Design a protein with these regions (language model features):
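Conserved catalytic phosphorylation-site environment of P-type ATPases
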Residues: 63-70, 172, 273, 283-359, ...
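Conserved cytosolic catalytic loops of P-type ATPases
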Residues: 115-208, 313-356, 398
Length: 627
């Protein structure tokens, strides 16, 4: 508990003790009134103060106003009729207990999320004259060498230049299994170094590092509100004035009706009491507090599992997802290409690889990198001229003055060359040198071990259709789709074709159904932003993914997609439970209050009791590990 909460708790205890003592003091009249005002002011002075401020600022209709009017009115009725002030003070007392509980619950949720996302480093170690000096991470320039000792957080993204260790990435990915890291490996901020001392050359400033982007994303998620939250805000705006005027009508109209049409006693005290009970019941705290708390807890629970959601609106959209579209490379497959062989070549294997690697040297595409890796020597780019990249086909260039073409069968057709056709599964890179076909290079990409299980999990979660888009050949695409159990596959697509295909798929679905696109974030930004919900996978260290997507999965496990959908559905289920429960109970109690069956004690349950139950239910959204 913080200082403010402890102060409220002390006031609750003092007021409760004073009420018990006063119960046994047999005094009447004005002295009884003055004595009971002591516990009332102890417990309610801040509510009265806020209500007065609201009236002064012309922001009248809120829960403080409702409680102030209800309790002051109840005291006035008690003073006029029987001198029993217990109910009025009990209303304020239990309201404060409910508020304290809500404050504690929200604080606890925030603390849980802060602990789960406790990845912000406090300092970075820099070696000066053989001694380690702690500096603020913001002060470390790009290219500096920092030292991370066992047990410390990696403060800034970089590359390991000395040492090896195991890293705990659980705060980022939700996975407890440690990862090995060695010299030459890229390392991201937010990981915890578990064993050896590491020297890291920074590649980013702290503000641009992974840890800063993640924290910024999580902290700003509450600004993007869901339809449910916006509905509750609008509902409260009109609901509170409506119940205030209804209570006023309940206090005045029935007595007037009795006087004018029944020639009976007006029973002002009885009807004012009913109106005050009506006001206490009508307080919208349960909805106003529990709905945002449900989303807040849901986003926190998701972040614990390595699923970062940029706002509750995206969580709501994800819960309605019925179609999932995947990019193949890096999403369903490892995205780590390796040369599996060189075929139908007349030149030496090494020579074919040399020409291919040099021709592709200006590209950062994974296939280009795999060719450079297979070549195994340092690339001398001065040997390469006249590079031309032909979208959807491949590359032409001159290597040592020799014309080289490397690409798919479309490129060979464009150049008017006959080529070898093959049924081998993998990416085929055909090579032509000085206008003569020189064979093809087979490049393979492994399917991720959990991809098939991920598709099954999605279908079990009620996903109607799984679709894969790829620029790869039809043979490769069909083979991967068949192995994984994917419903539809579209192959040989250019980057622009993927957007058009997603547009086509969006037009096919129902109006209330949502379509999610899952990519690795490297070149999928247009498609991620076009889908109803964009999900970037394996985003550790990928700025593009964190910027472009609505939801970011921090590791490469496709099983997390189904988990993210289950988390969103649990969160929305809790939101609906709280909405229906709170509105249902309040409507019943409002009717009972209006006809005189409900008293102040039932009103207290309808307000404070419902709020406590709704808040407890909302906190369940934090616990999603077993989904």
């Amino acid at each position: 508990m913080n200082k403010k909460q402890k102060k409220v708790l002390a006031r609750i205890i003092i007021a409760a003790v004073l009420m018990i003592i006063l119960h046994f003091i047999p005094v009447k009249g004005i002295i009884r009134f003055l004595l009971y005002m002591v516990p009332y002011l102890v417990i309610g002075y801040d509510i009265l103060k806020k209500a007065f401020k609201g009236i002064k600022n012309k922001q009248v209709f809120d829960e403080n106003f409702l409680m102030a009017v209800a309790t002051v009115g109840a005291i006035a009725v008690a003073l006029y009729e029987n001198g029993d002030y217990t109910e009025a003070i009990a209303v304020m007392l239990f309201y404060q207990i409910g508020e304290l509980f809500q404050s504690y619950a929200v604080g606890k949720s925030r603390k849980n999320i802060s602990e789960l996302m406790d990845i912000r480093p406090d300092y970075a170690n820099i070696e000066v004259d053989g001694k380690l000096t702690q500096v603020d991470p913001d002060e470390v320039a790009i290219g500096s060498v920092i030292v991370v000792q066992p047990g410390e957080k990696v403060p800034i993204d970089g590359v390991i230049v000395e040492g090896s260790s195991t890293l705990n990435t659980s705060a980022l990915t939700g996975e407890s299994a440690p990862r090995d890291a060695k010299c030459g490996d890229e390392i991201i901020s937010g990981c915890i170094n578990m064993s050896g001392v590491l020297k890291i050359k920074t590649t980013k400033e702290f503000g641009e590092s992974t840890v800063s982007k993640i924290l910024d994303l999580v902290e700003n998620s509450s600004s993007k509100k869901s339809k449910s939250e916006n509905f509750i805000s609008k509902f409260a705006k009109y609901y509170t004035p409506a119940v205030c005027y209804s209570a006023l009508a309940l206090a005045i109209l029935p007595p007037l009706f009795r006087i004018l049409f029944m020639s009976a006693e007006p029973q002002w005290g009885s009807w004012i009491y009913r109106a005050l009970t009506f006001l206490v019941i009508s307080c919208p705290c349960a909805l106003v507090i529990s709905i945002p708390l449900s989303f807040f807890a849901g986003i926190g629970g998701a972040s614990r599992e390595g699923v970062l959601v940029k706002g509750s609106n995206y969580l709501e959209t994800l819960s309605q997802t019925r179609y999932v579209v995947f990019d193949k490379t890096g999403t369903m497959t490892e995205g780590v290409f390796e040369v599996a062989g060189v075929y139908d070549n007349t030149l030496d294997r090494e020579k074919v690889l040399e020409y291919a690697a040099l021709a592709e040297s200006s590209s950062s595409h994974p296939i280009s990198r795999s060719l450079q890796k297979a070549y195994g020597k340092e690339i001398d780019r001065t040997r390469v001229t006249d590079i031309e990249e032909i979208s959807g086909h491949g590359i032409t260039a001159k290597v040592d003055g020799v014309s080289v073409a490397a690409g798919n069968y479309k490129l060979m057709k464009k150049l008017g060359l006959s080529y070898s056709e093959t049924d081998k599964v993998g990416t085929i890179v055909h090579i032509a040198i000085d206008g003569s076909y020189e064979g093809y290079i087979l490049i393979s990409d492994k399917i991720k071990p959990t991809s098939a299980a991920a598709i099954k999990a999605l279908k079990k979660a009620g996903i109607k259709g799984t679709i894969m888009l790829t620029g790869d050949s039809r043979t490769v695409a069909d083979s991967v789709a068949a192995e994984l159990g994917i419903d539809e596959v579209y192959s040989e697509l250019l980057p622009g074709d993927k957007v058009a295909k997603v547009e086509e798929l969006l037009a096919r679905k129902g109006s209330k159904e949502k379509l999610a696109f899952v990519g690795d974030g490297i070149n999928d930004a247009p498609v991620l932003s076009r889908a109803d919900i964009g999900i970037a996978m394996g985003a550790m260290g990928s700025d593009a993914a964190i910027e472009a997507a609505d939801i970011v999965l921090m590791d490469d496990d496709p099983l997390k997609i189904a988990k993210a959908i289950k988390i969103s559905r649990k969160c929305l289920r809790i939101v609906y439970e709280n909405t229906y429960f709170a509105i249902g109970i309040k409507l019943i109690c409002l009717v009972l209050g209006a006809v005189g069956i409900a008293n102040m004690w039932l009103a207290i349950f309808a307000d404070v009791g419902v709020m406590v139950i709704a808040v407890l239910n909302a906190i369940r959204a934090l616990f999603v590990h077993k989904l």
